[in-house]
Design a protein with these regions (language model features):
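Charged, amphipathic alpha-helical linker segments immediately N-terminal to NTP-binding catalytic cores
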Residues: 1-5
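N-terminal Rossmann NAD(P)H-binding glycine-rich loop of SDR-like oxidoreductase domains
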Residues: 33-54
């Protein structure tokens, strides 16, 4: 099945940009420290792999799903190998005290990607799910911004 043909394209969406800006991307990533929150989810894994490929000084990945994190690390190790930088994963909730301790103990990050989210949830389902959705998708982002500033 030719997915590109199905969506009316001949090339993946960002191929040209990645090719044109390859040097700038590599310099930016190679010289910086990254934190990816929700890094074991579908989008998080793709972002983590792209950063990893460019050998950052540090790449720390946080995700609440230990199983998805194990799969991410196995996939990266089997396809991309290792980097010179500090690559670590943490199976913790980004709203937890452990997460706060991690951020406070870190050397800081140049870039933080918050890709954590409750998806596929009908927010009108019940008030408890709605409260959790607001906590994960909004309040944890606000807390991370505050922790990064401190």
């Amino acid at each position: 099945m030719d997915i590109l043909k199905m969506i009316g394209r001949t090339e993946p969406l960002f191929n040209e940009d990645i090719t044109n800006y390859r040097k700038e991307l590599e310099e930016l990533v190679t010289n910086n420290r990254f934190l990816v929150i929700g890094g074991a989810g579908s989008i998080g894994q793709a972002v983590t792999r792209e950063i990893f490929k460019r050998n950052p000084i540090a790449l720390h990945v946080v995700d609440i799903s230990e199983n998805n994190m194990v799969e991410l690390v196995r996939d990266i190790r089997s396809t991309l190998g290792y980097i010179d930088g500090d690559f670590r994963t943490f199976s913790i909730d980004c709203g937890s005290d452990e997460y706060k301790a991690l951020i406070r103990a870190s050397e800081g990050y140049d870039y933080i990607f918050n890709l954590s989210a409750l998806k596929h949830v009908r927010s009108e389902k019940d008030p408890y799910t709605l409260m959790r959705l607001i906590e994960v998708n909004i309040l944890n982002t606000i807390k991370t911004i505050q922790l990064a500033k401190d």
